[in-house]
UniProtKB/Swiss-Prot annotation:
Biased composition (Basic residues): 1390-1403
Signal peptide: none
Principal location: nucleus
Protein name in the entry: Histone-lysine N-methyltransferase SETD1A
Quaternary state and interactors: Component of the SET1A/COMPASS complex composed of the catalytic subunit SETD1A, WDR5, WDR82, RBBP5, ASH2L/ASH2, CXXC1/CFP1, HCFC1 and DPY30 homotrimer. Forms a core complex with the evolutionary conserved subcomplex WRAD composed of WDR5, RBBP5, ASH2L/ASH2 and DPY30 subunits; WRAD differentially stimulates the methyltransferase activity. Interacts with BOD1L1 (via COMPASS-Shg1 domain) at replication forks. Interacts with HCFC1. Interacts with ASH2/ASH2L. Interacts with CXXC1/CFP1. Interacts with RBBP5. Interacts (via N-terminal region) with WDR82; the interaction is direct.
Taxonomic lineage from the root: Eukaryota, Metazoa, Chordata, Craniata, Vertebrata
Species of origin: Homo sapiens (Human)
Annotated ranges, domain SET: 1568-1685
Length: 1707
């Protein structure tokens, strides 16, 4: 180590010492003169100085190893400055003075009371110097200002020990000393001492107070330490004269509930203004010292601020007439005073008075008459503010304003802590508005008195002038707490709560408050606008004084600030809307107001301080005021030069106002537009636009005002055109109330940015301001018109931009979030495969879509269309309650369960992801509009959207419902319930479910029409899974749903064509089949391919069935087919709505590549035939023809109507998820059993019904084989995906499905005779040249019986392993015939497994009708639902086996994707362990009533054995207490006993021991926790729930005190009534306590011959009471007993206590 001054010898070594120690330091040890340098010791041996006197350490040890050393904690407190007379700087508000305390309050109690609010440093109770009597005064010093403020806020005017205490921040205890003097002098008692207002100030004012000169005032201010001496110099006689101050201030303040009420500290800063003799008065009476006008120091802030303000205002507004000047001055003074007095929310009156006083003080020449005029103004709450606003501020005023404004802005920034605090504490009671932020020039309202403030007034003062004032000003405020009860945070919080757009935080500073007060200058009692704006530029206008409050809030010139002013700190503000409502200026008020003094103009009216007004223009309007109302239009200001009264407000700091205005605008917009929340992005955009507009135009144009252009310029944050600059903003709102151009004056009060310069034309002359309301209105109308157009255009532009932005964002959002990119890719791949069919289907679907414009994507369409259409058009749209948010609803990703019918619908709509349900609901109409625009930008693929839109459009109604989840939820809930029932009683439930399903399907059909649209809107519509799910029934109809067709591209194409046709049919059917809730509208389920479709060409051609109306198709098909028919309809190319496609076409239309969904092995036949016909390149059969051809028989059965039913074979919940076209009951087995829609065993057995595992597998593989017409794997994945899946990205699902493809696992069983006559599927056969193709061909949802698939097709399907049999719909039939060949083995196996599964799951369905009809193939939706069940219930062994089989089959297929070769089978844990619902056993609880009704059941005895099951002798509560440690309780009890003993010993005599006092003491705290329960002794007993020590009071025996005679009578009556127990307890010879019918738990105490308690009679307040005391320690759960001590009688009452010493009887 480098030695600083080491000796040469020691420094010589080149190596560095490891350790060193400073041995000698001459600087620290002056005694050692000899060493002139420091001496170091290195490594304990070597020294830096060669001196033998230093002895090295002998044993070198690591100094750190102090094994025995002890660590001691050093307290190193941070030194704090002592706040004595030498302290320089602002004294922190850490001292709280309490007054009117109960004389029992001592230091400890007070400290504990205050400690919760902050760390207490010192507590002192003031005692009388001679008598040492409690004076009710206390001083508490906190370590932080926060604690002090919180204490005042929470304890002021609260009851403590019966006294309403007074708490206030008190710098240096100035107020406390005043109270002390008043009490010690005998003037007041501790409980009557005035804690604020005039009384207190007068007490300390000298007799000469009235004549107090400016000098004396200066002295006062200096005493206050806040009042600048210079300020008083200007003090006018008015200031000096108490009468002038009192009059002006008191009048206004008195009129307004003390603006400076005890809650509002006089100093705006909120520091108690100690200097003012009037402090108490100002605080309590809401009078400032100046208000007091006693010679005693006027409010320092008022005086100095007023003086400065007056001077400035005077000079500025000198141009205006004297009267107007005086008025303006008064107004300004008032504003300033109010600002100072009431921090943020200044009372107009107070502000006016303060301004007047300032004016007077500032101008020594200020005539007394001015003062009187000011008073008059205050009393009248004269409108001069408006006038002032209208008048162009004089140049001087502008200068003054500029000077002031800088501080004002500063003050605008963070409110001074003290002030806010005071405001917070200011109770609402003080009606006077809290002082507005002091004008910048004026200095902090609180600091107004400070010379700095005065100087600032004269010259621009530094930010937070209030602060600039010496701490004294704060001290000056008597009730600092009241001066600013609201801290900035609290005010902001308050504003937020009020949802105001005003910027209270801006005006938070004292200056701001003063400025606000100035702005309030013109405030009139009548509610005329107080020209707060005059005093304040950017500052938010102080709330109008209470007097103004009474008047129409608009009256106040400040944008609500004045109106708010009535409430100090904004706490008292009458209405949260004060910014808006209060801001409305009543024309009458304006008219009545005297000409505003020029001074007020100095400061542009600040927006209402507490709530930052949105652009002041808006602020003037009541929040609730409809933005679109004409009231906004304000008459243009007179062209003449604006009255000098309004000097152009100095431009507020751009950052402040831009920011503020933007915020205001946003807030206002939010408030105006039905409170619809705006997204952060929207807000940001809006603000950006506003800012740009402001920069570019500097006009109102920038405002993204309320949607309605009605706001006009006023709405805009930017200053309106000069005319409107002042008036417009507020005028708009003001007019809202008065319908007149109140704005002119109000505008001046707007923040500076808003009222840039008073434009001569814009400013209204004072006379104008005074015009009667009509005249003003006329003026306003005339004046507003010019700007109205600009405003409207700007707003329109903004709205349009917002719409476009929102549309773009929404589209992007919808595209990204709703239609996932992966899903799109997957979809596209499918589309490519299905293109041949898609094209035809899409064309038809498009036609249908055009005819039936439906929302393509509920959320997206509605949003986009709404935006494009202009929403509600105009800002008004936003103004509507739903608001922007309502209009723009983002898609909900919430998984909604749809009933089968809904699902089918959803599948049709599947592609479009419905936006949030709520959105969908709201958007439905718009969505319908949008439906017409399927290809909307932002929707995923326009094609899909179109298709989807078409289907959705058709189903929009239901979709809307579904979007809400109402339909789906209802159906699904019912289905779920049924499903649960099924779980309990699967077989029974299944049977019931079939009926239920039929009913549900019918109901859902009806609902489906509604829910169709809803389902479309539902997420399922968007999700492919949904498409798949819906594709079954919907894909048939889904073909109609182009979206679905797009979802499974092949499917979608066919489904599109079939969609359109099916849609048409569905539409037609819907009316007819509404009961069935013809799901056809659900076009989304493209996935539902009809196996026929692949063969479509042949089938279509071959099938004689021409496209029948959907109804016809439905009839053609059995009811069940009807459900499916819609899906098949989608399959057939959508025909123009004109002709409903034949059912056959639907199957064809089903997505050519409809994904046959494998039913999850559980609960449903594992083999679910998916009528998913992969769109094979083969041309689709003619849309109409294929369905009929496909289902000649089925069609004949009944063209599937749009009736939505729960998909059979699907659990209700799945059915709800996948609404398939309700199959008509005729469908027979097809109907879902138990609402689950499972196929009957026979159905399952049938090849057609077999799940198209191969198809599923093929679907899964489809992505790989896009080129292949059939996508078994893809279809599988589609099939697998249910509506829930639909929400998930399909690509992922497909991949997962491929890995876990159980569909392919089971080869199609040999086709059993097709349930429906297998429709010839030549095209499908061709299409499904590969097994996968075949599989895809057979859509599960075959509405009509599909012609048996051509053998080759079936063979192909079988080969692919997709087994059309899975497609229980058409494919089932087809497979039943065709798959019987090769698929017979697999099909049979699968069917058997499914059948067995179905048997397990539900009772065997009735013998299936002929295979074709008896067992209609499940709709693709059913298949998907069944397949998707794996996601809900988990993977069971059957699912696993099918997955394995599918995987193996896929590997064996040559057509399989190559990627399969890279995969290997991995066993997956079985997650669906069937745990049948545990049926409640009768013995689990009380027996069930045999009759089912407790009332009709009558009474039946319950044996004790039964009761014991649910009655525990030892209640849980008691058992819980067993583990409780009784030691603590015993300790407490012992302490209490010892305390009693001490008390007794202190009292002494035994006589006293029996005194009531002692007994009462014994009773008061001794309630024990007891409970009653079954007793081993007799019936009920009383048990202890806590340990009870000996000689403790246990309980009082409570009852009715009756005489002996009454007791005898009652006893006889009780016996007659059968009341065997006696609850009569004798107190003495005359009194008996009867607890029989009225008492407490004590009556349950049983008798015991060896009791643990005894009864004692004590007298309390001349009443005898029976108290049970413990005789010995009693444990928890021990029964309380005592000896009844019945008199001996011959008739013995047996004793049941059973103790060893039992006497055997009670008497």
């Amino acid at each position: 180590m480098d030695q600083e001054g080491g000796g040469d010898g020691q420094k010589a070594p080149s190596f560095q010492w490891r350790n060193y120690k400073l041995i000698v330091d001459p600087a620290l040890d002056p005694a050692l003169r000899r060493p002139s340098q420091k001496v170091y010791r290195y490594d304990g041996v070597h020294f830096s100085v060669n001196d033998s006197k230093y002895i090295p350490v002998e044993d070198l040890q690591d100094p750190r190893c102090h094994v025995r050393s002890k660590n001691r904690d050093f307290s190193l407190p941070v030194p704090k400055f002592k706040l004595d007379e030498f302290y320089i700087g602002q004294i922190p508000l850490k001292e709280v003075t309490f007054a009117r305390l109960n004389d029992n309050v001592r230091e400890t109690f007070l400290k504990d009371m205050c400690r919760k609010y902050g760390e207490v440093e010192e507590v002192e109770i003031l005692l009388h110097p001679r008598t040492r009597k409690h004076l009710g005064l206390a001083r508490v010093l906190f370590t932080s200002t926060r604690g002090a403020k919180e204490t005042v806020k929470n304890l002021h005017l609260t009851s403590v020990m019966g006294n309403i205490i007074h708490a206030q921040l008190d710098i240096k205890g100035q107020q406390r000393m005043k109270y002390y003097e008043l009490i010690v002098n005998g003037s007041y008692t501790p409980q009557t001492v005035p804690t604020g207002g005039k009384a207190l100030s007068e007490k300390f004012q000298g007799s000469g107070a009235a004549t107090e000169t400016a000098e004396s005032r200066r002295r006062s201010s200096s005493d206050t330490a806040a009042y600048p001496a210079g300020t008083t110099a200007v003090g006018t006689p008015g200031n000096g004269t108490p009468c002038s101050q009192d009059t002006s201030f008191s009048s206004s303040r008195q009129d307004t509930p003390s603006s400076f009420g005890q809650f509002t500290p006089q100093s705006s800063q909120g520091t108690p203004y100690t200097s003012r003799g009037s402090t108490p008065y100002s605080q309590d009476s809401a009078y400032s010292s100046s208000t007091t006008s006693t010679s005693f120091k006027p409010r320092r802030s008022e005086n100095s601020y007023q003086d400065a303000f007056s001077r400035r205002h005077f000079s500025a507004s000198s141009a205006s007439t004297t009267a107007s000047t005086a008025i303006a001055a008064t107004t300004a003074a008032t504003a300033s005073s109010s600002a100072s007095s009431s921090s943020l929310s200044s009372s107009s009156s107070s502000s006016s008075s303060s301004s007047s006083s300032q004016f007077r003080s500032s101008d020594a020449n200020y005539p007394a008459y001015y003062e009187s005029w000011n008073r008059y103004q205050r009393h009248t709450s004269y409108p001069p503010r408006r006038a002032t606003r209208e008048e162009p501020p004089g140049a001087p005023f502008a200068e003054n304003t500029a000077e002031r404004f800088p501080p004002s802005y500063t003050s605008y920034l963070p409110p001074e802590p003290s002030r806010p605090t005071d405001q917070d504490y200011r109770p609402p009671a003080s009606e006077a508005p809290p002082p507005e932020p002091p004008e910048p020039g004026g200095g902090g309202g609180g600091g107004g008195p400070s010379p700095e403030r005065e100087e600032v007034r004269t010259s621009p003062r530094p930010a937070s002038p209030a602060r600039s004032g010496s701490p004294a000003p704060e001290t000056t405020n008597e009730s600092v707490p009241f001066a600013q009860h609201s801290s900035l945070d609290s005010r902001i919080e308050m504003l937020l709560k009020e949802q105001r757009s005003k910027f209270s935080f801006l005006a938070s500073d004292t200056e701001e408050e003063e400025e606000n007060s100035s702005m309030v200058l013109g405030a009139r009692d009548t509610g005329s606008e107080v020209p707060s704006g005059s005093g304040h530029g950017p500052c938010t206008p102080p709330p109008a004084p209470a007097n103004f409050e009474d008047v129409a809030p608009t009256g106040s010139g400040e944008p609500g600030a004045t109106r708010e002013s009535p409430k100090a700190n904004g706490q008292n503000q009458a209405s949260p809307c004060s910014s808006g409502d209060d801001m409305e200026i009543s024309d009458d008020d304006r008219g009545g107001s005297p000409p505003p003094a020029p001074t007020p103009p100095q400061q542009p009216p600040p927006p209402p301080p507490p709530p930052p007004p949105p652009p002041p223009y808006l602020a003037s309007l009541p929040l609730g005021y409809p933005p679109h109302q004409p009231a906004y239009l304000l008459p243009p200001r007179p062209d003449g030069p604006p009255p000098p009264e309004y000097p152009p407000p100095p431009p507020p700091p751009p950052h402040i106002y831009d920011f503020v205005n933007s915020l205001e605008l946003m807030d206002r917009l939010g408030a105006q537009w039905g409170g619809m929340p705006m997204s952060f992005q929207m807000q940001t955009q809006m603000l950006t636009r506003l800012h740009q507009l402001r920069q570019g135009k500097g006009l109102i144009a920038a405002s993204a005002g309320p949607p309605g252009g009605a706001f006009g310029e006023a709405f805009l944050p930017f200053p309106p055109p000069q005319e409107a600059a002042y008036g417009l903003p507020y005028a708009l709102y003001a007019q809202g109330q008065e319908g007149r151009g109140a704005y002119s004056r109000e505008a001046y009060h707007l923040p500076m940015p808003m009222a840039a310069e008073p434009l001569p034309s814009s400013s209204v002359s004072g006379e104008e301001a005074r015009l009667p309301p009509r005249e003003e209105a006329e003026l306003a109308e005339g004046k507003t018109l010019p700007t109205a157009g600009t405003v409207g255009r700007v707003l329109a532009m903004l709205v349009q931009e917002m719409k476009s932005i929102m549309q773009r964002d929404l589209n992007r959002k919808m595209v990204e979030n709703v239609a996932f990119g992966a899903f799109d890719q997957w979809w596209e791949s499918k589309e490519e495969k299905a293109k041949p069919f898609q094209n035809a289907a899409k064309q038809q679907a498009k036609e249908e879509d055009k005819e039936k414009t439906k929302l393509k994507e509920p959320g997206l369409l509605s949003l986009v269309d709404w935006a494009k259409s202009g929403g509600t058009t105009g800002i008004e749209a936003f103004a509507f309650g739903s608001g922007l948010r309502g209009a723009l609803r983002l898609p909900s990703f919430k998984v909604k369960r749809k009933e089968p019918s809904e699902i089918s619908e959803a599948s049709e709509e599947k592609r479009p992801r419905p936006s949030t349900p709520a959105e969908e609901d709201e958007d439905d109409p718009e969505q319908e509009k949008e439906a017409g625009e399927p290809g909307r930008p932002g929707t995923k693929p326009p094609k899909r959207d179109e298709e989807r839109g078409k289907t959705q459009g058709k189903h929009r109604k239901s979709f809307a419902l579904d979007s809400e989840g109402e339909e789906a939820s209802q159906e699904s809930s019912s289905e779920k319930d049924e499903e649960d029932d099924e779980e309990d009683e699967e077989d029974e439930d299944r049977e019931e479910a079939v009926d239920t399903t039929k009913k549900e399907t019918e109901v859902s059909d009806g609902e489906d029409e509604e829910s169709d649209s809803s389902s479309k809107c539902s997420l399922y519509a968007d999700s492919d899974g949904e498409n798949d799910s819906t594709s079954d029934s919907e894909s048939s109809s889904s073909s109609s749903s182009s979206s679905s067709s797009s979802s499974s591209s092949s499917s979608s194409s066919s489904s599109s064509s079939s969609e359109s046709s099916s849609e048409d049919e569905e539409e037609e059917e819907r009316p007819a089949a509404l009961p069935s809730a013809s799901p056809p509208p659900r076009e989304v389920p493209v996935p539902t391919p009809a196996p026929v479709e692949v063969p479509v060409p042949e089938r279509v051609a071959g099938s004689p069935v021409t496209p029948l109306p959907e109804q016809e198709a439905s009839p053609a098909r059995p009811a069940g087919p009807t459900e499916e028919s819609p899906p098949s309809a989608p399959l057939r190319p959508p025909e123009p709505p004109a002709g409903p496609p034949a059912p056959a076409p639907r199957p064809d239309e089903r997505p050519s590549s409809p994904i046959p969904l494998l039913p999850p092995p559980k609960k449903r036949r594992k083999t679910v035939s998916f009528s998913a016909i992969e769109v094979v390149p083969a041309p689709e059969p003619p849309p109409a023809t294929p369905p009929q051809a496909k289902f000649p028989g089925p069609a004949s059965r009944k063209a599937p109507r749009g009736v939505e039913r729960t998909i059979r074979n699907l659990p209700l919940d799945h059915a709800s998820l996948v609404k398939s076209w309700p199959e008509e009951v005729s469908r027979g087995g097809r109907s879902r059993a138990g609402g689950r829609g499972r196929l009957t065993e026979e159905e399952e057995a049938e090849p057609g019904t077999e799940v198209d595992l191969a198809v599923l597998a093929d679907l899964a593989l489809t992505p790989a084989r896009r080129g292949l017409p059939a996508l078994p794997a893809v279809e599988d994945s589609e099939a697998t995906e249910t509506s829930d899946e639909a929400e998930r990205p399909r690509p992922l699902l497909s991949h997962i499905l491929l890995e876990h493809n159980y569909a392919l696992a089971v080869k199609p069983t040999p086709p059993a005779p097709a349930l429906r006559p297998p429709e010839p599927v030549p095209a499908p056969a061709a299409l499904f040249s590969s097994p996968a193709d075949e599989v895809l061909e057979a859509p599960e949802v075959v509405v009509a019986e599909a012609e048996e698939p051509k053998p080759q097709q079936l063979q192909q399907q079988r080969e692919e392993g997709e087994e059309e049999g899975e497609e229980e719909g058409e494919e089932e039939e087809e497979e039943s015939s065709d798959s019987s060949s090769s698929s017979d083995g697999e099909g049979a196996l699968r069917r058997r497994s499914l059948r067995s599964h179905a048997r397990r799951r539900r009772p065997p369905p009735p013998p299936p009708p002929p295979p074709p009809r008896a067992y209609e193939p499940r709709s693709e939706f059913e298949q998907m639902t069944i397949l998707y069940d794996i996601w809900n219930s988990g993977l069971d062994s059957e699912d696993m086996s099918y997955l394995r089989l599918t995987y193996e089959r896929l590997l064996q297929q040559t057509s399989g994707a190559d990627w399969l070769n890279d995969t290997h089978w991995v066993h997956h844990t079985i997650t669906n362990l069937t745990t049948p619902k545990r049926k409640r056993r009768p013995q689990d609880g009380p027996r069930e009533h045999q009759t089912g009704s407790a009332r009709s059941e009558g009474y039946y005895p319950i044996s004790k054995k039964e009761k014991d099951k649910y009655l525990d002798v030892c209640p849980v509560s008691a058992r819980q207490l067993e583990g409780v440690d009784t030691q603590g309780t015993n300790r407490v009890l012992s302490e209490r006993r010892s305390e009693q003993r001490r008390l007794l010993s202190a009292i002494g005599t035994s006589a006293i021991m029996d005194s009531d006092l002692l007994k009462l003491n014994q009773l008061k705290f001794r309630k024990k926790k007891l409970r009653f329960g079954r007793s081993r002794i007799h019936e009920w007993g009383l048990f202890a729930m806590e340990p009870i020590a000996a000689d403790e009071m246990v309980i009082e025996y409570v009852g009715q005190n009756i005489r002996q005679m009454v007791a005898d009578m009652r006893e006889k009556r009780y016996v007659q009534e059968g009341i065997g127990s006696s609850y009569l307890f004798r107190v003495d010879h005359d009194t008996i306590i009867d607890a029989t019918k009225c008492g407490n738990l004590a009556r349950f105490i049983n008798h015991c011959c060896t009791p643990n308690c005894y009864a004692k009679v004590i007298t309390i307040e001349s009443q005898k009471k029976i108290v049970i005391y413990s005789k010995q320690p009693i444990g928890v759960d021990e029964e309380i007993t005592y000896d009844y001590k019945f008199p001996l009688e011959d008739n013995k009452i047996p004793c049941l206590c059973g103790t060893e010493s039992c006497r055997g009887s009670l008497n």
